């Protein structure tokens, strides 16, 4: 709502609030660490992880729009350099979710998002190439996450 009416500052506050609430719920549910049934995994954990991933990406997009709206100078760094910095930060989040939670749902959202960035920014070689590298890195992490979870006997799942 806020974003559609160019209320970018308010939109950022709404998104940060939603992101904070989702993180609190994610931690409370202990996604990736507590054994759950297959039904709960597919109806709660995976959708929650995917939604948290999308809201994480959307929050970055909203902050980016807000900074553009207020003509932020970026501490002298070019917008393309900031895009690469944000890709690195997002990759670190994906790595954190893989190492601490083996959460492939969250990481697959990053794969999709980075591929979209690479495609949309194809004219900006630095951004596009960095996004493709990030896409491949996240895809590798997602696959690693699934393999490790299965190697552990899918230890989260309760029969």
For every predicted segment, state its role.
Residues 27-33, 143-158:
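Membrane-interface capping segments at transmembrane-helix boundaries
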Residues 44-53, 72-86:
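A loop-to-helix transmembrane entry motif
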């Amino acid at each position: 709502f806020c974003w559609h009416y160019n209320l970018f500052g308010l939109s950022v506050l709404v998104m940060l609030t939603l992101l904070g609430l989702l993180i609190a719920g994610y931690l409370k549910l202990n996604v990736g660490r507590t054994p759950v049934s297959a039904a709960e995994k597919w109806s709660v954990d995976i959708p929650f992880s995917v939604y948290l991933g999308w809201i994480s990406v959307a929050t970055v997009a909203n902050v980016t729009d807000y900074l553009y709206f207020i003509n932020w100078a970026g501490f002298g760094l070019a917008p393309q350099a900031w895009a690469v910095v944000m890709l690195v930060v997002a990759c670190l989040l994906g790595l954190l979710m893989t190492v601490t939670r083996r959460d492939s749902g969250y990481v697959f959202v990053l794969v999709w998002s980075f591929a979209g960035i690479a495609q949309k920014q194809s004219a900006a070689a630095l951004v596009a190439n960095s996004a493709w590298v990030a896409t491949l890195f996240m895809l590798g992490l997602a696959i690693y996450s699934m393999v490790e979870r299965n190697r552990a006997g899918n230890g989260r799942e309760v029969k």
